[in-house]
């Protein structure tokens, strides 16, 4: 993937860039693997906003991605196309299995149209192949990793990210996450070899607020510029700093969104670096 920069013909185009989509081989998705996607605009069943800054955006169709692949062990698949997916940062690959079935997977770096990949304990260690962690050698770069055996890929699915398999001891494998955290995972969990493709996606400069609106992201207004009725930081004469520790519009302290006693925390060997003073 490359990035194409625009000439500054308008203020919105100045500094803006876009993917050149050089890896994409087809522009329309496989019809049998597409489902309707209805935007909720951040509202719950009562119509109240539960997630702010969401709404609008271009109409999308959901591409059904195979995050398990365990039921296709031993069946080779040919990469028919590399496609764009508006619902994620990574590209997706359309696989044609020898038994006639078609499925989408996350497209790893280096996977090309015409490549043949497989899944199963005896699969080769090459990008796109899916194996249990117990069958992957230490030091291998992987992505789309399960947290529970058979639960489907949960980790490292975004563009350009990867996990390194550090080693195996007993029934657990040690993984270095993209955040730097080292975590133990059951060796029966499956992973796909290679790193996720479309790595340059993080370098795209969106250029203008309108492109964010196309993605369904609404403006984020600071509390200190609101009125007292709208936010605890609002009001004051002239510009003020809020006069209190940062809080949400409902008065809850900012941050601290993680559950302090998660059962899976016991599997963390080394925590990620946050840059915060403890």
Curated annotation (Swiss-Prot):
Keywords: Ribonucleoprotein, Ribosomal protein, RNA-binding, rRNA-binding. Residues 1-20, 25-58, 223-278 are annotated as: Disordered. This is Large ribosomal subunit protein uL2. Belongs to the universal ribosomal protein uL2 family. One of its GO terms (cellular component) is large ribosomal subunit. One of the primary rRNA binding proteins. Required for association of the 30S and 50S subunits to form the 70S ribosome, for tRNA binding and peptide bond formation. It has been suggested to have peptidyltransferase activity; this is somewhat controversial. Makes several contacts with the 16S rRNA in the 70S ribosome. PANTHER family: LARGE RIBOSOMAL SUBUNIT PROTEIN UL2M, RIBOSOMAL PROTEIN L2. One of its GO terms (biological process) is cytoplasmic translation. The keyword Transmembrane helix does not apply. The gene is rplB. Residues 37-58, 269-278 have a biased composition (Basic residues). InterPro entries: NA-bd_OB-fold, Rib_uL2_dom2, Ribosomal_uL2, Ribosomal_uL2_bac/org-type, Ribosomal_uL2_C, Ribosomal_uL2_CS, Ribosomal_uL2_dom3, Ribosomal_uL2_RNA-bd_dom. Part of the 50S ribosomal subunit. Forms a bridge to the 30S subunit in the 70S ribosome. The keyword Ribonucleoprotein applies.
């Amino acid at each position: 993937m490359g990035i194409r920069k625009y000439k500054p013909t308008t203020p919105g185009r100045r500094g803006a860039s876009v993917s050149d989509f050089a890896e994409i081989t087809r522009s329309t998705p496989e019809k049998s693997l597409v489902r309707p996607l209805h935007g909720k605009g951040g509202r719950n069943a009562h119509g109240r906003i539960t997630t702010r800054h969401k709404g609008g955006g271009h109409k999308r169709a959901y591409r059904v991605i195979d995050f398990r692949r365990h039921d296709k062990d031993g069946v080779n698949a040919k990469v028919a196309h590399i496609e764009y997916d508006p619902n994620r940062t990574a590209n997706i690959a359309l696989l044609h299995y020898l038994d006639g079935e078609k499925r989408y997977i996350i497209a790893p770096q280096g996977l090309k149209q015409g490549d043949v990949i497989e899944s199963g304990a005896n699969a080769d260690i090459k990008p796109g192949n899916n194996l249990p962690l117990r069958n992957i050698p230490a030091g291998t770069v992987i992505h789309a990793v399960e947290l529970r055996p058979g639960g489907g890929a949960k980790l490292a699915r975004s563009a350009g990210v990867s996990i390194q398999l550090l080693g195996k001891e007993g029934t657990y494998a040690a993984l270095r996450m993209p955040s730097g955290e080292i975590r133990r995972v059951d060796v029966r969990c499956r992973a796909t070899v290679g790193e996720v493709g479309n790595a340059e996606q993080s370098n795209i400069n969106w250029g203008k607020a309108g492109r964010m609106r196309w993605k369904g992201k609404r403006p984020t207004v600071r509390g200190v510029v609101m009125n007292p009725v709208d936010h605890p930081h609002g009001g004051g004469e002239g510009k003020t700093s809020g006069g209190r520790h940062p809080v949400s519009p409902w008065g809850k302290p900012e941050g601290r969104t993680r559950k302090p006693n998660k059962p899976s925390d016991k599997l963390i060997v080394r925590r990620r670096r946050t840059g915060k003073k403890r």
